[in-house]
């Protein structure tokens, strides 16, 4: 039986172009690897791979992908928000984590070995960086 802490990686996926979606998938995979290495957690990011099977621009397929992600989230111990921006899909995942009284943290890949606890949903608005200032 696996006794490692299971961490759900929450990072942006949706983007206007397929190239941007691919970049976001690579970013999610990087976060999975870093969280596993830095904290020893078993990290999950379904959105790092699902766009290879499902079209994020198709509403039905996007809903299916979000549903799958929520199912994976329900099997995790905590949620880690990666990056500086909260997308609409991330918002759904984060609200579910708070609803289930799951521990929620922020992680910035440039600030390794640090998880910042998020105790309240309102903190996320304070941490949000305007879209025009984002380079991820």
Q: Model-predicted segments: where are they?
A:
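Conserved catalytic or regulatory cores that recognize and/or transform ribose-phosphate-containing ligands
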Residues: 1-136
């Amino acid at each position: 039986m696996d006794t490692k802490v299971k961490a759900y990686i929450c990072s942006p996926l949706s983007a206007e172009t397929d190239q941007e979606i691919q970049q976001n998938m690579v970013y999610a995979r990087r976060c999975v690897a870093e969280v596993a290495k830095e904290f020893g957690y078993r990290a999950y990011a379904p959105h790092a791979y699902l766009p290879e099977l499902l079209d994020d621009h198709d509403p039905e397929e996007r809903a299916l992908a979000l549903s799958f992600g929520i199912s994976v989230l329900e099997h995790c111990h905590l949620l880690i928000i990666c990056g500086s921006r909260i997308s609409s899909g991330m918002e759904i995942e984060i609200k579910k984590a708070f609803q289930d009284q799951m521990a929620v943290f922020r992680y910035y890949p440039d600030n390794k070995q640090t998880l910042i606890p998020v105790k309240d949903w309102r903190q996320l608005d304070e941490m949000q960086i305007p879209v025009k200032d984002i380079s991820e």
